[in-house]
Amino acid sequence: MFKVIPQDIQSRYSHQISPLLISKINNCELLYEPLSPAELHSYIVNYINILSSDLVKAGEGRISHWESGWKENLEEFKKSLNPESLIPKYHKKNNIARLNKQIIKSYSKDFDYHLHSFFVDALLLEHIPNYDKVFEFGCGTGYHLFRLNNYSPSKSFYGGDWSVASQNNISECSKAIGSHNIKGFNFNYFEPDYSIDIKDSLVYTVASLEQIGEKHDKVLEYFVNSKPGLCIHFEPIHEVLDPENLLDYLTIQYFNKRNYLKNYLTSLRKLESEGKIRILDTRRLYYGSKFIEGHTVIIWKPV
């Protein structure tokens, strides 16, 4: 049996992670063990069978699904008044995850969510102090925003999402906890609203561009033209995976089957070659959920 330690997160980044986050990791008992050879064999067979089935595809037609899901979180929040009730249900689906290039099984409550938040916070807490305004696009329930606000309550946080339920979540939670610096706004990746002013601000996405497949041209153009100070993505990026590696190959097939984000890094590299942006970092974190390594980091800025 192993425990997630700060070095598991630190080893994937070049900067020193926040002492506050280190303390949080140390106080969180995230226990796991790698799958045995027999378990890994069963996992791979099951994965292949999943890929042979009909999987729900991401895209524009899924908005009603997200509206329903975020409304469910809101109803739970109204009963508990606990921001943790905003954590999406997909973080609670199973006890299989990925860490340090291994498939693992967890033995701790909300393992997937906590591990995910450690990797996200480790990077964002390095950059948030440099900006007055922080924008999350595709923020869902707003759970990242409220968690980050605990570290940086003097900053202004904004969460954009195409779901109206998302804005309701943020409004209700902000009222309940007495927060005046977290606000929601409606934003559709497929039809970006240029009235949303992100100039010189920190912009980030966490597994939300995932949902737009190849249709990222409009939102990428919006990001470039709106001149944010910095853009950080935690997204499924097939270009960094190795199709000669079995687990990477299966992940790529899963991306394709679900119509997840495609060719986004390729588009960024083209923009960089044209002198329009500068890519500062592309980094595999080697952690993920049961079926995918879905949070490769890309950091870039408009020129």
Please provide the spans of the model-predicted regions.
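A short SAM/SAH-binding and catalytic strip from SAM-dependent methyltransferases
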Residues: 201-215
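Conserved Class I S-adenosyl-L-methionine
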Residues: 246-272
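Class I SAM-dependent methyltransferase SAM/SAH-binding core
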Residues: 143-191
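Class I SAM-dependent methyltransferase core
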Residues: 136
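Conserved alpha-helix/loop element of class I SAM-dependent methyltransferases that forms part
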Residues: 112-130
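N-terminal accessory regions of S-adenosyl-L-methionine
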Residues: 1-118, 248, 270, 274, ...
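Conserved glycine-rich SAM-binding loop
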Residues: 140
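Conserved beta-strand signature within the Rossmann-like core of class I S-adenosyl-L-methionine
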Residues: 228-239
